[in-house]
Amino acid sequence: MRTRHLVGLISGVLILSVLLPVGLSIWLAHQQVETSFIEELDTYSSRVAIRANKVATQGKDALQELERWQGAACSEAHLMEMRRVSYSYRYIQEVAYIDNNVPQCSSLEHESPPDTFPEPGKISKDGYRVWLTSHNDLGIIRYMVAMGTAHYVVMIDPASFIDVIPYSSWQIDAAIIGNAHNVVITSSDEIAQGIITRLQKTPGEHIENNGIIYDILPLPEMNISIITWASTKMLQKGWHRQVFIWLPLGLVIGLLAAMFVLRILRRIQSPHHRLQDAIENRDICVHYQPIVSLANGKIVGAEALARWPQTDGSWLSPDSFIPLAQQTGLSEPLTLLIIRSVFEDMGDWLRQHPQQHISINLESPVLTSEKIPQLLRDMINHYQVNPRQIALELTEREFADPKTSAPIISRYREAGHEIYLDDFGTGYSSLSYLQDLDVDILKIDKSFVDALEYKNVTPHIIEMAKTLKLKMVAEGIETSKQEEWLRQHGVHYGQGWLYSKALPKEDFLRWAEQHL
């Protein structure tokens, strides 16, 4: 993946690393409050169901105890027994004795009005009859839950079924409805119209209506359902509390993640990784600076110079990134890339012009490489060019240790490559050991060409090269005066802006065709 794409990806990850923990913390706060809200609603429904079962069980126990009583119906002793049972069982409001569903007496009155009980709304599995009735001996219009056997009926206040403290962080209301006709038996607050029907259509699901969340718990054995609800306003308050807990944690995690991603981003944007990426993606290309004969101005070859295009349209020269490649162990892959590019660009041209050559620079770190000689052999065979057409340029640094460099240079020369000594004269020992170097061509550094008029060393270099029968290439020729001086002093070849700057492949080929 290209560095710029990777940088874009990691920049996106950086943004996510900050926003995601914060967003996640807000989401978790909301989820925790909502989960807690629903759990408390469900828990309250279950507690109301337990209470309803407890009340119903107490009613059954009271009826069983009344059925065991023996004596004259509606006598003082009988009335006292019914009053005792009504008093003893806390949820029982009244006890009535009936005969053929007609009340005869109750714990409140010696004689009851002869109002016949209707058919029960529900008969439980264990035979108890259940009504929702407003019948009582006091004449008060108030619905009560009646449970009965053949001879007794106990009246239970419906509010007893939902008389449960929520123990929650917010107000929860509850209602009990009769399943037969959806009649509200009791409710702690008014319930919205239509909610009962909607809840019965989606059992087990929660419904939100006008900022209120409803839950239903059917109790088919009692023919009732429990509905609980609470306002979401309290949910929002709880959410704000949780945000203050989760948000700082999310910010801390986000900042730590951002610091980690920034370290990765800085590393990827480092010069080392940028150069490595450029090599792997073949972003580094080769330009070619013509080398001409000073005798007739015709081209004899070119020096291959690496160029690294930048995103702003500029180019980096080798002086900018070759030292970096040497420091970071990228010299070998960079050199291999340049060699491949030279043959891909110039292989056909060299085959068509066997008198031309391309010189390639080799740096110290790659002299011992086994991959470079092998690649040169493979490319030469593939493009069918003469090894002499690929010259290798080495600086005097590469010759600093003759014991190491001599066998390597000898191997390249035996393979047919001419060896250029580049930047000659810039080091402290160059003149002293020139005669011991096994090279073919001496390149006179641009600094000596620039100072022809006031440096005496240049003529000495030229004379030494002549003595050793070395051909010479002068670099950095920019004026006709320099060209004339060099030609008069016997320098064979030259390169510089007087002739052409380093050119991309297509431009170079056009220039070369005009100067053959």
Curated annotation (Swiss-Prot):
Gene: pdeB
Subcellular compartments: Cell inner membrane
Gene3D superfamilies in UniProt: EAL domain
EC number(s) per entry: 3.1.4.52
Matching InterPro entries: CSS-motif_dom, Cyclic-di-GMP_PDE-like, EAL_dom, EAL_sf
Residue span(s) of domain EAL: 268-516
Membrane topology according to the record: Multi-pass membrane protein
Membrane-traversing stretches: 6-26, 242-262
Protein name per Swiss-Prot or TrEMBL: Probable cyclic di-GMP phosphodiesterase PdeB
Catalyzed chemical reaction(s): 3',3'-c-di-GMP + H2O = 5'-phosphoguanylyl(3'->5')guanosine + H(+)
PANTHER family, per database record: CYCLIC DI-GMP PHOSPHODIESTERASE PDEB-RELATED, CYCLIC DI-GMP PHOSPHODIESTERASE PDEF
